[in-house]
Swiss-Prot record:
Keywords recorded for this protein, A-Z: Cytoplasm, Fatty acid biosynthesis, Fatty acid metabolism, Lipid biosynthesis, Lipid metabolism, Magnesium, Metal-binding, Transferase
Protein name as catalogued: Holo-[acyl-carrier-protein] synthase
The keyword Transferase belongs to this UniProt entry's keyword annotation: yes
EC number(s) given by UniProt: 2.7.8.7
Cofactor entry: Mg(2+)
InterPro entries xrefs: 4-PPantetheinyl_Trfase_dom, 4-PPantetheinyl_Trfase_dom_sf, ACPS, Ppantetheine-prot_Trfase_dom
Role: Transfers the 4'-phosphopantetheine moiety from coenzyme A to a Ser of acyl-carrier-protein.
GO cellular component: cytoplasm
Amino acid sequence: MIIGIGVDIIEIERVRQAIQNNKNFLSKLFTERELDYFISRNMNSEVIAGNFAAKEAVSKALGTGIRGFSFKDIEILRNELGKPEVILHNGANLIGNKLVGNNNSLRVHLSISHNNSSAIAYSVLEGEYYGNM
């Protein structure tokens, strides 16, 4: 059963400027494994913006936005085929598990895309729904 959906779109230039103007921008929002991925992609602004939009989309699918946890609690990685995968940690994991009654049925689906100016991400949470947050 679908228990949450979220979408986010961001201007890539805004992310590019945030990286240039705030030396802590990346380390505040992304895990070491995400940063390693960005390095492997030559710190491509489109990739970074896509991951940022993905974190926002997942937080919206959880129904909370970024409340009760940090950006780093939503980790966006890629599998061997390049498909984005979501790993929830700490507060985000607690919220996700609460949605499914701690029955380990939560699955997070994610799609990320971009063009020259914007990055977009769409997330769907699937699992056995157990009620209100």
